[in-house]
Amino acid sequence: MAKRDYYEVLGISKDASKDEIKKAYRKLSKKYHPDINKEEGADEKFKEISEAYEVLSDDNKRATIDQFGHDGPQGFGGQGFNGSDFGGFSGFGGGGFEDIFSSFFGGGSQRDPNAPQKGDDLQYTMTLTFEEAVFGTTKEISIRKDVTCETCHGDGAKPGTSKKTCSYCNGAGHVAVEQNTILGRVRTEQVCPKCNGSGQEFEEACPTCHGKGTENKTVKLEVKVPEGVDNEQQIRLAGEGSPGVNGGPAGDLYVVFRVKPSETFKRDGDDIYYKLNVSFPQAALGDEIKIPTLNNEVMLTIPAGTQTGKQFRLKEKGIKNVHGYGYGDLYVDIKVVTPTKLTDRQKELMKEFAQLNGEEINEQPSNFKDRAKRFFKGE
């Protein structure tokens, strides 16, 4: 099944700016986010929106889509084949059959090795108590990540030294490679493996980062946990990922939450559930019982004749929605508890109650010991 046009998915024109792409994505992702939209198909719609944004926000991927269409650069001029016909063929620097066409037809999807590139995104898993997730908190975390080298400030060269023309590619930034392929011997150009396309090399590499421009360190960060986060949800800390390349922006850090269950409540989204045991007299006669909520205790009125399974709803006594859409509710589920041990007087009263109710009770022992006693008494 062919993919939908990514511009159509986001509802934008093909000459849309990056800001217009981002605005359209934010609007649609908020509308179809699975945590907000429970309608059937919303999850797939959200994935489609995310995929469209991922492609159109990347200049190289967008250029490929604009040049070859949404099915990629496989179909050319009625040749009757595409890249999948050649299985795992990768005779052009590991790029596969599509890269052969890139060489023949102008290389529209090739990336400039000197172009600014965003750094890698990172992920951190944070464990929260139920209370921390409900009310929000601020926590300090320690993560190991690549940071800009303090010695060379990301340049890669030893301070006080300069760069020189790459001796491998003579400053071109790329080298010619000839390879035998199924189409014959083909000459292609590849990024210089020594200078990574810059055309320059160090007189002397930085002694701290050994020319990488980055060093791996433990970094402490303060993370503000918003009220109402749920298990598996995440927040993005912009610019806290790995450093960018060639002056590109740093990546982002995604903090994924693991929320411990509550000993008092069961959570379902923004709603919480509380199990309340009531005695037989309380259920039969009614009562007022003090129950816990997230912030304090309140009195709950139990009407006379309440049965097991009865549910009471306390509006807006649940969890604050993490996106700011009000509060959930607190549901109280009733369970009428049958007494397991009765005094003789209590038994008499229960029998009297049964008689008044027109019931004839054939009392049964509750365990082996009681049955044995009745046997030896001849009952």
From Swiss-Prot:
Q: Where are the zinc fingers (CR-type)?
A: 136-218
Question: Start-end of the CXXCXGXG motif repeats?
Answer: 149-156, 166-173, 192-199, 206-213
Question: Can you provide one Gene Ontology molecular function annotated for this UniProt record?
Answer: unfolded protein binding
InterPro entries per the UniProt record, alphabetical: DnaJ, DnaJ_C, DnaJ_domain, DnaJ_domain_CS, HSP40/DnaJ_pept-bd, HSP_DnaJ_Cys-rich_dom, HSP_DnaJ_Cys-rich_dom_sf, J_dom_sf
Q: Which UniProt keywords apply?
A: Chaperone, Cytoplasm, DNA replication, Metal-binding, Repeat, Stress response, Zinc, Zinc-finger
Got a GO cellular component term for this one? cytoplasm
Q: How is the cofactor bound?
A: Binds 2 Zn(2+) ions per monomer.
Any single biological process term in GO: response to heat
Record carries keyword Chaperone: yes
Required co-factor?
Zn(2+)
Pfam families annotated for this entry?
A: DnaJ (PF00226), DnaJ_C (PF01556), DnaJ_CXXCXGXG (PF00684)
- Where Zn(2+) 2 binds, per the record, is at C166, C169, C192, C195
Query: What SUPFAM superfamilies would the database entry show?
Result: Chaperone J-domain, DnaJ/Hsp40 cysteine-rich domain, HSP40/DnaJ peptide-binding domain
Functional summary from the UniProt entry: Participates actively in the response to hyperosmotic and heat shock by preventing the aggregation of stress-denatured proteins and by disaggregating proteins, also in an autonomous, DnaK-independent fashion. Unfolded proteins bind initially to DnaJ; upon interaction with the DnaJ-bound protein, DnaK hydrolyzes its bound ATP, resulting in the formation of a stable complex. GrpE releases ADP from DnaK; ATP binding to DnaK triggers the release of the substrate protein, thus completing the reaction cycle.
What note about domains is in the entry? The J domain is necessary and sufficient to stimulate DnaK ATPase activity. Zinc center 1 plays an important role in the autonomous, DnaK-independent chaperone activity of DnaJ. Zinc center 2 is essential for interaction with DnaK and for DnaJ activity.
Family to which the UniProt record says this protein belongs: Belongs to the DnaJ family.
State whether it acts alone or in a complex, and with which partners, per the record. Answer: Homodimer.
What name does the UniProt record give this protein? Chaperone protein DnaJ
